[in-house]
């Protein structure tokens, strides 16, 4: 029978019992990343709609695809950096862990926040996808759509890779800032 002495407070838990992964920080970073991505994409869409009528005869999809792709890449990077920074900054303090391990864990938190935001966006995309039971397009329209889709996929892939890296770097920066603030408050006591 336990008399309650088995309970270990998280504040004084041995290092072996402390998790290296702070899921609360990761999910908070992912949520912030998704929210920021929606805001940035809305701004880009509004800017694109505002600018597109200025071209005589409108803008063809082939001409507009690189612009949209570059906007997607930029939005992904900025949103992922925010999510990664928050994941690194909000994580718990690890005691008795070497600086190299802290840096690795911070970058892992950024990468996990990025991955969680990608999974969240995929789930939102599946839930919001329209029913595709419309008329069959002509072969020329299908070829044109495939060409545009391939270009956008390339931009989204580049954006995904660069935003994963950006989230990891931002998490390392956020973690360093968190640890620096912790040291500063400790010396002021």
Residue ranges of model-derived segments:
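Juxtamembrane interface at the cytosolic side of transmembrane helices
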Residues: 165-189
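Alpha-helical transmembrane segments and their helix-start/interface "positive-inside/aromatic belt" motifs
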Residues: 16-35, 68, 103-119, 169
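Mid-bilayer segments of alpha-helical transmembrane spans in multi-pass integral membrane proteins
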Residues: 77, 81, 85, 110, ...
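Perimembrane loop-to-helix junctions flanking transmembrane segments
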Residues: 51-65
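Short, membrane-exposed interhelical loops at transmembrane-helix boundaries
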Residues: 59-60, 138-152
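Functional transmembrane-helix hotspots
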Residues: 122-140
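Alpha-helical transmembrane segments of multi-pass membrane proteins
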Residues: 32-49
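Interfacial helix-start motif at the membrane-water boundary
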Residues: 62-76
């Amino acid at each position: 029978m336990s008399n309650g002495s088995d309970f270990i407070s998280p504040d004084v838990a041995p290092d072996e019992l402390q998790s290296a992964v702070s899921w609360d920080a990761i999910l908070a970073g992912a949520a912030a990343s998704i929210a920021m991505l929606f805001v940035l994409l809305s701004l880009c869409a509004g800017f694109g709609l505002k600018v597109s009528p200025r071209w005589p005869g409108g803008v063809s999809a082939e001409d507009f695809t690189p612009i949209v792709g570059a906007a997607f890449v930029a939005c992904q990077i900025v949103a992922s950096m925010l999510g990664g920074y928050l994941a690194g900054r909000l994580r718990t303090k690890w005691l008795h862990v070497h600086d190299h391990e802290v840096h690795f864990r911070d970058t892992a938190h950024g990468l996990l926040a990025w991955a969680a935001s990608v999974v969240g966006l995929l789930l939102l995309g599946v839930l919001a996808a329209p029913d595709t039971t419309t008329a069959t397009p002509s072969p020329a329209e299908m070829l044109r759509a495939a060409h545009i889709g391939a270009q956008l996929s390339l931009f989204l892939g580049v954006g995904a890779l660069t935003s994963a890296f950006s989230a990891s770097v931002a998490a390392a920066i956020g973690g360093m800032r968190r640890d620096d603030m912790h040291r500063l408050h400790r010396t002021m006591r």
